[in-house]
Amino acid sequence: MQLIDTHFHLDYYKNHRYWYEKINELKQYTLCVTNSPGIYHSCKRLYKETKYIKFALGYNPQQSVEEPFQRELFLREIPKTSYIGEVGLDFSRKYIATSRTQIDAFEFICDIAAKENSLLSVHSRNAEAETLNRLKMSGVTRAIIHWYSGDVVTLNKLLDEGYYFSINANMCSTVKGR
């Protein structure tokens, strides 16, 4: 069975050129997510998409602390991709103060994604039910939930909507993850 990496931050690596080449050499299908439109733009400027590497336009909810969501920049980049990620909600203690800002940005992104039929890579820490609600309200049909850590009831509702989940080894090493 061929695995697909649906959540890889190429820009996190100092030796990103090496990883770009290695992914292509291994023929490993990979979705390279980004944390902001600026990072997405930089990745697209440095690297071309290949059969094995696609870039996703993102706005990580954790960015809301440092960098306001720029709708115009997001709208300018959206025609260049069918993939959106990393986007979502993070209501953990460190980011809960920006929950309203996160919701506003995520609603905007979900509305665009539904219209464009884009595939989303979604962050949902401590906000799983709200994330599900926003995806459904916007009519998003194509989403991959990244590193899910919520309850089983919400998990089943996400599955009922036809959403997918990205699973990694670290997730499976905890009791809750298993």
Positions of PLM-derived features:
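Mid-domain alpha/beta scaffold segments of enzyme catalytic cores
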Residues: 1-178
